[in-house]
Swiss-Prot record:
GO terms for cellular component: cytosol. One of its GO terms (molecular function) is ribosomal small subunit binding. Residues 117-127 have a biased composition (Basic and acidic residues). Disulfide bonds: none annotated. This is Ribosome-binding factor A. Gene3D superfamilies: 3.30.300.20. The gene is rbfA. Belongs to the RbfA family. Residues 128-137 have a biased composition (Acidic residues).
Length: 137
């Protein structure tokens, strides 16, 4: 048995996904000139076991769903350029085809947080005596 075991969950596809994420982030920051993707952040990349596809999840700082859909379209159209640029840095026989997905998780989280804050404020208005006595159930 080898003394140098790789940690669980860090197999070849994980390493390739990590490398793709880093390289795509660099490409978006320095190589893409389209302003619709300037604020895009690569959140996650998952690669198929045979390395034929990479699912790329991104967010846009301070943008809405409409801007996200537009950026997804731009990135999809630029996927050929991005894939060929990736091929130069990846140490694989083939370069995965890129599929871009706008990740709405941050917007959903902010919306849920806002709803919770509003509900708590409304609850405080309806039961102000709890705030005075410190009886928060």
């Amino acid at each position: 048995m080898s003394r140098h075991r790789r940690p669980q969950g860090f197999n070849r596809t994980d390493r390739v996904a990590d490398q793709i994420q880093r390289e795509l982030s660099r490409l978006l920051q320095f190589e893409m000139k389209d302003p619709r993707v300037n604020l895009a952040t690569i959140q996650d990349v998952t690669v198929s076991r045979d390395l034929s596809y990479a699912e790329v999840y991104f967010t846009l700082l301070g943008q809405g769903e409409e801007a996200g859909a537009e950026a997804e379209e731009v990135l999809t159209k630029a996927s050929g350029f991005l894939r060929s640029s990736l091929a130069q840095g990846l140490n694989t026989r083939t370069t995965p085809k890129l599929r871009f997905h706008y990740d709405m998780t941050p917007e959903r989280a902010a919306h849920l947080s806002q709803l919770i804050d509003e509900a708590r404020a409304e609850d405080r208005e309806l039961r102000p005596e709890d705030d005075e006595t410190g009886n928060n159930e």
